[in-house]
Amino acid sequence: MFQLDPLCGHEPLTSGGTIKEENFVKSFWGWNNSALHNPMVRGYFAEFLIYRALLKMDGQRFQVPISHFATRIESDVHDLVFFLDDVKYTIQVKSKDSYSQDQFFKTSLVQGFNYATNTPIKTPSHWSDFYVFAYLQLDEVLCDLVKGFHFEWNKSLVTQTEKNKRIFKQCQDEIVRSVLELDNWSFYIVEQAHLDLKSEISLAQLTTSVSERKACVCNYERLPYMLMRMALLKRARALSC
């Protein structure tokens, strides 16, 4: 949120100004966000990855309004923003993992709002310049094991043996490590116009778009370069009109 500094984790829980527990925020983060493979947390994680990639762009011409994005913005029109010289470019981030039953990314095809006239724009559209679809490859065997244990234990706790709990924990830990491994991530970048007002797009469609040069795909290390390149191309087209 604009001008909200990130917490450091050491903030205490207080009562009447008296400290009741040190480092309470860090404990809360560990309790709330450790399941990095959870779809909601994974989405936040992907957005943060892309924000950090923006900070690696060439600082001579590209700038990120750090004071605005020092903490995540909820329910804003755009997830992220950067500038090429004095021109603003906006980003929408979507994520999906390989184990998701639904292999379609939502594209945020929504109604807009005209702040100049204070009226809604009723025709749905895509409002960001670039859409980054972050795809996470997970181990299907590990995910199946976790899902199977959940299913069995929801029916009966009898099967919750010490051995099974140990296997379950190992699987969970390995899946979390998978989220933190950059080699498991791929990033598809699509310009607004090439979404063709689709409300969702599949991984197969994204792959086709790459082959048709309507999108690009890269690993995390190449992400800053690809975003700079696409912004420069978009700027060049605008100047040539």
Predicted regions and their residues:
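Nucleic-acid endonuclease domains
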Residues: 1-78, 82-89, 94-241
